[in-house]
């Protein structure tokens, strides 16, 4: 299986530019440590769907050990966090976990992740700041 190499955001400036300059697609950023098991699993999933979602989403990786600028602002305390942005606006999604700011658990199904990204993108285009996930992850609640 050929996987797409996802672009790395190596500085805070690169993260800002990715969020600010994309005007048509959802910006998806996986924050975490590249050698963390959860990150590796999620990176594989994200790289496997990148080509399928390229028309409405762009996916980036950001190592929080290299870029610590956003740790406090986005509360990046989990080993792996996926966040969503559209038109320079942080998009929130209710996954049923109590934390609408970020996805901080592993989604292990490609179609589920595509559906989540598409739902957030459709909500963002309608100027909704918070959308409800098509799947309930209450059982994956992370403290």
Curated annotation (Swiss-Prot):
It comes from the Eukaryota. Belongs to the DIM1 family. GO terms for cellular component: nucleus; spliceosomal complex; U4/U6 x U5 tri-snRNP complex; U5 snRNP. The modification N-acetylalanine is found at residue 2. SMART domains: DIM1. This is Spliceosomal protein DIB1. It is found in: Nucleus. Essential role in pre-mRNA splicing. Also essential for entry into mitosis (G2/M progression) as well as for chromosome segregation during mitosis. GO terms for biological process: mRNA splicing, via spliceosome. Its main location: nucleus. It holds the Pfam family DIM1. Keywords: Acetylation, mRNA processing, mRNA splicing, Nucleus. Component of the U4/U6-U5 tri-snRNP complex composed of the U4, U6 and U5 snRNAs and at least PRP3, PRP4, PRP6, PRP8, PRP18, PRP31, PRP38, SNU13, SNU23, SNU66, SNU114, SPP381, SMB1, SMD1, SMD2, SMD3, SMX2, SMX3, LSM2, LSM3, LSM4, LSM5, LSM6, LSM7, LSM8, BRR2 and DIB1. InterPro entries: Dim1, Thioredoxin-like_sf.
